């Protein structure tokens, strides 16, 4: 059930008002951080640790429910978030989050050494892949319109453990990404002012290389962006809308000028690096499409989720794909791909046609793009943290929503402090080595979760049906990994790819022939299981294109998070799931 009606929202608000009258928002008692029975004393904690194995088995097999996420979990915040966003707000929040400085840097690099003029096809391929993930997010956002986004979706369909590991990694990468944006913002501003990207940084020779350039400007930018996010969601949305309009005007200028000074001869040869170059560039430019998942976290603050979320997310991603393709085409038609400056493609291209002043427009657009990405990222990261805190995987104190602003101030402060510390000390070179493995991993898991949601309902799906579903799902995942491994190991010839492709087709066709045990109430992904299955394949293929450093970092971070989960998160969530309160039970009616 979806409590999206005004009456249900009123009921939640009334209960929250009664509770907030008895408690002050500004509090920090031990009970606010660790209210669970396992943490009441050393003896209870020792007893909990001794029961780690059976508790882990319980949480591995336990899933949350729609009802719990929509009602009981939200009450952990004591005050409701305000439903103040429309599809128009979501569309531009997504635009502001996704369209940053990356397109100005990556397009030139990939056109020069990756795909040539065919980089426009790379953007189209990545756009389609991102759109498939958007469709999955949109269906879940309509069905479970809460602040946690993918964390809640995975918790409902795949369970506590997988949701925590995935959420922990993506939250870490989101904070690292915010720190990187802060450092990039500082570099861009310094380049415009003094033509020296390190102009605002403080050199400390006694610190290790990569951590010896302190960046107070990056910290200031993060503090301002997160401070605005704390004052109110609607206010942040309006500011994002205004700045996004500036970006649109500059992009229109770039595209129009590019086409008016274009030469079709610059598009020949169109495939200088072959089909492989197009696909490899698609994996690189895909990062220009990330960020929409932060907007999915705003579902709880959307006025009409069933209408606004599909229009906002799907509409924005479609628009962004067209914008990126036009920008790539304009650049490659304006300048021969062999003459494109990989480091400052658009600025140098305009200089070649006598418009040196246009580099300032590009710089302003990049700065603005990073600013809106920080603003929307601040909103999304805080709400992700809020939902994790509602589950008690981290202290529930971070789930509290301020009664006046309707925003999770404590959660925002947490991500602000952590990302500011990272940005102050860590260089862009170090941050750029942290690839967005978890982002693709979660996109893949959300597609898997959508298939689970359609084909498996507890106590309804027969055991034979479940086994068939798991078998076909295994074929889809295994064949997708196989294609990625073949491609990235440089295997040539069509036989191996044909075999893996046929296996993927058989797995997907098998799912298509199985009966579905749940249908979307209002809006759903079309062509299930084909589109989610293709999304799984695309995301696994892109994961395979990452270097071994990304895999190693993911494994290390996961191991650290696993330690935290075994010593803290596991026992907190176990206590909440088994406390004698109806609203805290996980095994709701499915």
Curated annotation (Swiss-Prot):
The gene is CAT8. Belongs to the amino acid-polyamine-organocation (APC) superfamily. Cationic amino acid transporter (CAT) (TC 2.A.3.3) family. GO terms for biological process: amino acid transport. One of its GO terms (molecular function) is transmembrane transporter activity. It holds the Pfam family AA_permease_2. InterPro entries: AA/rel_permease1 (IPR002293), CAT_C (IPR029485). Glycans are attached at residue 195. The lineage of its organism: Eukaryota, Viridiplantae, Streptophyta, Embryophyta, Tracheophyta. Residues 1-85, 136-160, 231-238, 288-310, 381-407, 451-465, 515-522, 575-590 are cytoplasmic. It is a multi-pass membrane protein. One of its GO terms (cellular component) is plasma membrane. The keyword Cell membrane applies. Expressed in roots, stems, flowers and leaves. Mostly present in young and rapidly dividing tissues such as the shoot and root apical meristem, and in young leaves and petioles during seedling development. Residues 107-114, 182-209, 260-266, 332-359, 429, 487-493, 544-553 are vacuolar. Permease involved in the transport of the cationic neutral or acidic amino acids. Its main location: membrane. This is Cationic amino acid transporter 8, vacuolar. The chain crosses the membrane at residues 86-106, 115-135, 161-181, 210-230, 239-259, 267-287, 311-331, 360-380, 408-428, 430-450, 466-486, 494-514, 523-543, 554-574. Keywords: Amino-acid transport, Cell membrane, Glycoprotein, Membrane, Transmembrane, Transmembrane helix, Transport. It is found in: Cell membrane.
């Amino acid at each position: 059930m979806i409590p999206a009606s005004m009456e249900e929202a009123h009921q939640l608000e009334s209960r929250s008002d009664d509770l907030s009258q008895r408690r002050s928002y500004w509090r920090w008692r031990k009970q606010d951080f660790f209210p669970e029975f396992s943490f009441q004393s050393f003896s209870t904690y020792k007893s909990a640790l001794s029961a780690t194995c059976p508790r882990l088995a319980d949480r591995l097999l336990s899933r949350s429910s729609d009802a719990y996420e929509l009602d009981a979990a939200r009450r952990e915040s004591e005050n409701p978030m305000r439903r103040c966003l429309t599809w128009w707000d979501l569309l531009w929040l997504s635009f502001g989050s996704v369209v940053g400085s990356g397109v100005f840097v990556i397009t030139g690099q990939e056109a020069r050494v990756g795909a040539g003029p065919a980089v426009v096809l790379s953007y189209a391929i990545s756009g389609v892949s991102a759109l498939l993930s958007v469709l999955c997010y949109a269906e879940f956002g309509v069905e479970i319109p809460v602040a946690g986004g993918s964390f809640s979706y995975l918790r409902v369909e795949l369970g506590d453990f997988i949701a925590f590991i995935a959420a922990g990694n993506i939250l870490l990468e989101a904070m690292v990404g915010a720190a990187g944006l802060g450092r990039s913002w500082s570099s861009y501003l310094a380049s415009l002012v003094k033509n020296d990207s390190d102009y605002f940084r403080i050199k400390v020779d006694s610190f290790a290389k990569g951590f010896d350039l302190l960046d107070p400007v990056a910290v200031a930018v993060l503090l301002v962006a997160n401070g605005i996010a704390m004052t109110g969601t609607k206010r942040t949305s309006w500011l994002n809308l205004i700045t996004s309009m500036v970006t649109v005007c500059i992009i229109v200028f770039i595209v129009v000028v590019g086409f008016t000074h274009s030469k079709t001869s610059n598009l020949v040869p169109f495939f200088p690096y072959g089909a492989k170059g197009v696909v490899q560039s698609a994996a690189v430019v895909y990062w220009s499409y990330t960020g929409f998942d932060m907007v999915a976290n705003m579902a709880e603050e959307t006025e009409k989720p069933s209408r606004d979320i599909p229009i906002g997310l799907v509409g924005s991603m479609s628009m962004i794909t067209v914008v990126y393709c036009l920008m790539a085409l304009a650049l490659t038609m304006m300048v021969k791909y062999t003459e494109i400056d990989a480091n400052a493609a658009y600025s140098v291209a305009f200089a070649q046609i006598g418009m040196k002043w246009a580099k300032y427009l590009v710089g302003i657009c990049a700065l603005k793009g990073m600013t809106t990405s920080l603003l929307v990222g601040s909103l999304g990261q805080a709400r992700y943290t809020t939902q994790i805190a509602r589950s008690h995987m981290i202290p529930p104190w971070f789930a509290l929503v301020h009664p006046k602003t309707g925003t999770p101030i404590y959660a925002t402060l947490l991500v602000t402090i952590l990302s500011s510390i990272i940005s102050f000390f860590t260089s862009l070179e170090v941050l750029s080595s942290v690839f967005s493995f978890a982002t693709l991993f979660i996109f893949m898991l959300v597609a898997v979760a959508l298939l689970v949601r359609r084909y498996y309902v507890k106590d309804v799906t027969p055991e034979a049906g479940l086994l068939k579903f798991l078998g076909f799902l295994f074929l889809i995942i295994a064949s997708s990994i196989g294609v990625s491994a073949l491609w990235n190991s440089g295997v040539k010839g069509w036989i191996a790819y044909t075999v893996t492709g046929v296996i993927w087709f058989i797995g997907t066709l098998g799912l298509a022939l199985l009966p579905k045990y749940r249908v979307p109430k209002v809006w759903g992904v079309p062509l299930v299981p084909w589109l989610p299955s293709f999304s799984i394949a695309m995301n696994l293929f892109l994961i395979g294109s990452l270097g071994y450093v990304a895999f190693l970092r993911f494994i290390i971070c996961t191991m650290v998070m696993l330690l935290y989960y075994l010593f803290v998160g596991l026992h907190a969530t176990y206590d909440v799931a088994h406390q004698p309160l109806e609203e805290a039970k996980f095994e709701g009616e499915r």
